[in-house]
Amino acid sequence: MTFVTKPRVHHPNLPINELGLTRRDYEGSVSTLCAGCGHDSVSAAIVQACAELSLPPHRFAKVSGIGCSSKTPSYFLNRSHGFNSVHGRMPSVITGANLANRDLMCIGVSGDGDSASIGLGQFAHVVRRRTNMLYLVDNNGTYGLTKGQFSATNDKGSTSKKGVPNLYEPIDLVSLALQLGASFV
């Protein structure tokens, strides 16, 4: 947890969208992820898209699992609803949020370890049910939070920091989602 806070003063020249909000109104907390981590780019893209489309932040539900990627929902849409679920179980929790309030726009954030390992069954069934949600998988082929073990999506033959090769074929979540009937991949 960081104790660094973002200033709440808005620059007078920041563009304002149809809701009277600036891009800063769609941001969240200061990131605590490693410098250069691609997960921050995902958060920045969500902030930009929601601001440009004038989507009201309070109409979003963000749910994540466990891992580096699951820290990212706190970095975007600060005025939205959020929940960190247990490892691999984000799809069930966001399905519940979706069923409880059909007016919410649901974003599920998960990592490759969270979705392709312990949560693979959950991933398959939420896609098969065609739950109305955006399911983001931040896939870097590694368990970054625990410092570098291969995830189930890592390419065969890749080597770890210690030079050990990955002996297994990767699970291709994109192909699996398409095979299960996902409409937007």
PLM feature segments, named:
Residues 59-62, 104-107, 132-136, 175, ...:
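Structural motif
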Residues 150-185:
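Conserved thiamine diphosphate
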Residues 144-149:
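Glycine-rich, charge-decorated loop segments at or immediately adjacent to ligand/cofactor-binding or catalytic sites
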Residues 66-142:
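Thiamine diphosphate
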Residues 34-38, 82-85, 165, 169:
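Catalytic cores of large soluble enzymes that bind and process phosphate-bearing ligands
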Residues 40-45, 57, 88-92, 121, ...:
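Conserved active-site and cofactor/substrate-binding residues in soluble primary-metabolism enzymes
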Residues 1-60:
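Iron-sulfur (Fe-S) cluster-binding modules
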Residues 23-31, 71-83, 104-106, 153-160:
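Glycine/charged-rich beta-loop-alpha catalytic/anionic-binding loops adjacent to active sites
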